Design a protein with these regions (language model features):
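Non-ligating segments of multi-cofactor redox enzymes
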Residues: 1-198
Length: 198
């Protein structure tokens, strides 16, 4: 069996394509994204969301962005919260009384909800990046900007401690974190989703 250079390159390209396709297929069910307020349960969210981007357009802090392929095929081009772009201001700020994303969603993938019903996820602290925990300086920015009483406490060593049961996942602390790279990450862990049909 004699393989030409062209034949070898075709085999190599074919193998790379199969590898890429298998990676995409393995990401299909993955949906580790933080959804905007009022998001219905994930199994119905992806089928109901038109990917129309209305929620992105009306978000005053531009915290809502489109999920990419890295978030899974089923989640691709659906809205997610990116606290690096801005916090979700449903508690304080420009959005606290309107939550236009929930009111203007044409399909009901985002449902109007009360502020006290919202839990987008939880923030996780990486002590190896946190300025206060590294003792490279004093920093309590996360505690200073957090709009939820008791979500962050300061221990006796003047270091922030996060309380998942109180955190609502607005991402205000993530956005404000001065560490580079950020010491905080917003995860969908503990997110409260709206039952569907309601």
């Amino acid at each position: 069996l004699r393989v030409t250079r062209r034949g070898f390159l075709k085999l190599l390209a074919g193998g790379a394509s199969i590898l890429a396709l298998s990676r995409l297929i393995s990401m299909k069910g993955r949906a580790d994204v933080v959804r905007p307020p009022g998001a219905i349960v994930e199994e119905h969210f992806n089928s109901l969301c038109l990917r129309c981007e209305v929620c992105l357009e009306v978000c005053p802090s531009k915290a809502i962005v489109l999920a990419g392929l890295e978030d899974g095929i089923s989640a691709a081009n659906t809205p997610k919260i990116d606290p690096l772009r801005g916090p979700c201001e449903f508690l304080v700020g420009r959005c606290q009384d309107s939550m236009r994303c929930t009111k203007e969603c044409p399909t009901g993938a985002l449902q109007p909800v009360g502020r006290d019903e919202i839990k987008l996820g939880s923030v996780e602290l990486d002590r190896e990046r946190c300025i206060a925990w590294l003792e490279t300086g004093e920093c309590l920015v996360c505690d200073e900007v957090c709009p939820v009483l008791g979500a962050i406490s300061i221990n006796e060593d003047l270091k922030p401690v996060f309380h998942e049961d109180k955190c609502v996942g607005c991402g205000t602390c993530v956005y404000a974190c001065p560490a580079d790279p950020k010491a905080l990450v917003l995860l969908p862990r503990g997110a409260r989703r709206v039952a569907w049909p309601r």
